[in-house]
C-alpha cells in the first residue's frame, strides 16, 4: 500500500480529521478535544535535555548579590559549596541543589527564635566582708572533700599486680623464643666461614 492510499483510507474513516501527507502535520482524534474551549494547550516539542537552557531562577550568594542561574560556573559553585562545607563532587545541577537546600535550611534555622531564659540580676547593696577565718574554713572544707572523694574511688588492680608469676603459656613462649634465638645465633658463624675448595 502506498502512503497516499493509506492517507485516503484514514481520511474517510475519520471525518473532519486530516490524514498525514508528506511535510504536513498529523491530526489525531484527541486534537478535536483540545480545540474545545477550556481545554489545555499541549505543545509537542521534544526537549533534548530535561532542563531549559534559560532559567529565571535566582540564587542568593554569601555577599547578598542576586546572581542569575545561567551565569554560574561549576568553579563558582564548587567554591560556594566549599565555603559552606558541602560535598564538592557531582554535576552542576547537583551542586546547585545542595546549595539551595543548604541555604533554605539555614534560612529556616535563622528565622527560628530561640527563647533563652532571662537571667536574674542580683543587686548587692552591701558588700560582704571576708575575714581570714572564712577563707581558711572554706579552703579546709574543699581539701576535705577532695580527700574523701579520693578515698571513695575503687582501686583497680592491673594484671601484673594480681599475678606476679608467669603463666604456663608465657613460659612456653619465652622458652621457644630463647631456643630459636640460640639456634639462629649458632647458625650465623657457620655461614660466615669461608670454604676452601682443593
UniProtKB/Swiss-Prot annotation:
It is found in: Mitochondrion membrane. SUPFAM superfamilies: SAP domain. This is Altered inheritance of mitochondria protein 34, mitochondrial. The keyword DNA repair does not apply. It holds the Pfam family SAP. Belongs to the AIM34 family. The chain crosses the membrane at residues 172-187. Disruption phenotype: Increases frequency of mitochondrial genome loss. Residues 69-103 form the SAP domain. Keywords: Membrane, Mitochondrion, Transit peptide, Transmembrane, Transmembrane helix. Residues 1-55 form a transit peptide. It is a single-pass membrane protein. InterPro entries: SAP_dom, SAP_dom_sf. Present with 2820 molecules/cell in log phase SD medium. GO terms for cellular component: mitochondrial membrane; mitochondrion.
Amino acid at each position: 500500500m502506498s502512503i497516499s492510499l493509506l492517507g485516503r483510507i484514514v481520511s474517510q474513516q475519520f471525518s473532519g480529521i486530516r490524514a498525514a501527507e508528506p511535510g504536513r502535520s498529523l491530526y489525531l482524534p484527541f486534537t478535536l478535544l483540545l480545540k474545545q474551549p477550556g481545554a489545555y494547550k499541549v505543545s509537542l516539542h521534544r526537549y533534548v535535555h530535561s532542563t531549559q537552557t534559560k532559567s529565571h531562577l535566582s540564587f542568593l550568594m554569601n555577599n547578598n548579590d542576586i546572581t542569575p542561574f545561567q551565569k554560574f560556573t561549576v568553579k563558582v559553585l564548587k567554591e560556594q559549596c566549599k565555603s559552606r562545607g558541602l560535598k564538592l563532587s557531582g554535576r552542576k545541577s547537583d551542586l546547585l541543589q545542595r546549595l539551595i537546600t543548604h541555604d533554605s535550611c539555614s534560612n529556616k534555622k535563622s528565622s527560628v527564635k530561640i527563647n533563652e531564659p532571662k537571667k536574674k540580676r542580683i543587686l548587692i547593696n552591701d558588700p560582704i566582708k571576708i575575714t581570714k577565718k572564712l577563707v581558711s574554713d572554706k579552703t579546709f572544707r574543699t581539701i576535705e572533700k577532695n580527700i574523701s572523694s579520693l578515698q571513695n574511688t575503687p582501686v583497680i588492680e592491673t594484671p601484673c599486680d594480681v599475678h606476679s608469676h608467669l603463666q604456663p603459656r608465657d613460659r612456653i613462649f619465652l622458652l621457644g623464643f630463647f631456643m630459636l634465638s640460640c639456634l639462629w645465633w649458632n647458625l650465623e658463624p657457620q655461614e660466615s666461614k669461608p670454604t676452601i675448595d682443593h
